[in-house]
UniProtKB/Swiss-Prot annotation:
SUPFAM superfamilies: Zn-binding ribosomal proteins. This is Large ribosomal subunit protein bL33B. The keyword ATP-binding does not apply. Belongs to the bacterial ribosomal protein bL33 family.
Length: 49
């Protein structure tokens, strides 16, 4: 079952990305390196609750 999630920047805490994940394959919180438009660089983004 795929679920829509929001990714939050770890440095500026802005929620800029929406994505989906499969809870059966990835039960933990998702962490991806994505581009932050506020900081103009690639930063770690974490799944929000």
């Amino acid at each position: 079952m795929r679920v829509n999630i929001t990714l939050e920047c770890t440095s500026c805490h802005e929620r800029t990305y929406l994505t989906s994940k499969n809870r059966r394959n990835n039960p933990d919180r998702l962490e991806l390196n994505k581009y932050c438009p506020r900081e103009h660089k690639v930063v770690l983004h974490r799944e929000t609750k």
